Amino acid sequence: MKKNTASKSKGIRPVIMVLAIALLGSSFIAQGSVANDAMRNLSRGQYVKNMYLGWNLGNTMDANTETGWGQPVTTQAMIDAVHKQGFKTMREPVTWNGHFGGSPTYTIDATWMARVAAIANYALNDSMYVMINTHHDGWYNLSSTSPTVQAEVVAIWTQIANAFKSYSDYVSFEIFNEPNAGATNQYGGGSDANRAALAAYQTAAIAAIRATGGNNATRMIIVQGISASPIQASTLTIPIPDVNTMVSTHTYDPVGFSLSGSGTWGSTADSQSIVKNLTNLMSWLATKGKVVVLGEWGNTAADQLPSRIKHAYYYAQQVINHGGVPIWWDNNSFSGADGFGLLTRKAVPPTWGFPTVAQALSDGAASGVFPTSLLTETQPPIENKISLNSGLLVKAEVINYTLPKASSVSLRLFDTQGKIVSNLVQSNQSAGNYEMKLPAKGISSGNYILEFKAGNNFITKRINVL
């Protein structure tokens, strides 16, 4: 959420070599934490189940500086308190605007990057999952697809990905937050041009992250529709069909209670409305092969406390029952319609400003039952073997693959900006051995992302055309 009207103007920082940030990445990792664990090849359903219940470090790194909106410096003790209460995920919203230089490198300030990593380490030290995003970045204008914006998205995400490429899969990347700058009908899906621009930027970001290699080759990446609104989920254009992508929405439901402080909640009709909305959201996304991260939700200090407790319990329970992860928006504000705060961060040691609401979240999550249909979701190993000449691909290279059963086959090649430069489709092939040549025309030397699909199986590889 945008909870502050602080200036979003883009500051220009001294240029620091991108390579330096990449080299610093491995040194960020806290020794002995789950950040050092091996990648586990979890299905999306298992990953979301493990995330369980989440908490936002709101109005902190998403401000112009960590303390710029009146927050204290984040400490290990704060995150320890969150973990002790039963939360297993920390979402770390980050504003990068004002912390990187100009084109063409858009180099991120190394001190800011190091602080983002240090806070992530606090959660990883407690074996928590961490989501890192780009927040309050309204310069990603969606009125049309801009090559300049796309290049900026690629540069920023390449640097973030390089800084965290050695981290385990406990770290996930959320491409944006509530992307809507320049969009029409922001909470109803936007226009065709808006959706095309967002899909292009997210596709470019995914390709850039995957191209950095290391653990980023299979890291979970989270995308969202315009404004991250669940109302327009059916209009969401899913970027590259990558098996390690999920969808985030922000569900302040019902709006009158959750955002406006309308007072009471808890009738049978209230409960039925939440179930209906979650069922519609999850069912549609399931048809796209995605699972859901409820990246922001909550209720406020303006609401009556008994209703807040009921709502917190029920919503946390039902999100898990429907196969999602509920992540509470905590902005460290404790009064009025903007009072989503739960943890009093300035207290030493940190304490819960609304302990009964925090406990309701924990109890609600504990009572939830994650759908077994998502737990048994499998990402089968690719049986369609691809020969890529040890990772180097020449223009005349033959792609060899085996189909264990009849299916359609497609091969797409993306440049590092996320633009499709080649799209080959073979329909209804019988079981057997095949080969496909990458066409030389229109493809120059350089790095690309190759996406190979056979039936429901995907493989995505970084390749180099000589």
Regions found by a protein language model. Give the residues of each.
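Bacterial N-terminal signal peptides
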Residues: M17-S27
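N-terminal carbohydrate-binding accessory modules
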Residues: A30-R91
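Acidic/histidine-rich helix-loop elements
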Residues: L57-T74, G98-I108, G256-I274
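Short, acidic/polar
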Residues: T67-H83, V153, I274-L281, A312
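An active-site-proximal structural segment forming one wall of the substrate-binding cleft
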Residues: P72-T74, M78-K88, T107-H135, L142-I175, ...
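Active-site region of glycoside hydrolase catalytic domains
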Residues: A151-G263, N277-T300, N321-G324
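Substrate-binding cleft of secreted/luminal carbohydrate-active enzymes
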Residues: V275-P355
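C-terminal outer-membrane/trafficking sorting elements
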Residues: E377-L466
